[in-house]
């Protein structure tokens, strides 16, 4: 059995886009679960660089770097790892569309919480408590 120190860290960055009380979620190709859009850092990328690249790759839009604001950082245990998700809001330009990596995008309310992973559920909890996410 691994101790907490031995657990692998999955370090991710996510884009929190809320419109009309709903949060944007994406389902990658070949997966059954929806995620907050974003992904893992490549090399020595900063959070901002990761966010801009991942959102361009997944949703074909451009994040406006000057509008990026940190929402919070969340951690959750999964088997054999800890997932850390640094969350940011930002404006964007372009039209949201799925890329070759994404099967489907959808706008979720708090009622859809069971359809996202544990780390995303923590964000959902905070957003509904702040009145930003519809129940």
Label each PLM-derived region with a short phrase.
Residues 2-23:
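Conserved N-terminal beta-strand and adjoining loop/helix that marks the start
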Residues 9, 44-45, 49, 82, ...:
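Short, solvent-exposed loop/helix junctions and linker helices
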Residues 11, 74-98, 103-107, 123, ...:
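Active-site-adjacent beta-strand/loop module that shapes the phosphate/pyrophosphate-binding cleft
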Residues 18-58:
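Conserved Nudix-box catalytic region and its N-terminal flanking loop in Nudix hydrolases
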Residues 19-22, 91-95, 110-112:
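Short loop segments at secondary-structure junctions
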Residues 41-42, 75-76, 112-114:
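Short histidine/acidic/glycine/proline-rich micro-motifs that form metal-
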Residues 62-72, 88:
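A short coil-to-beta-strand element that immediately follows conserved catalytic motifs
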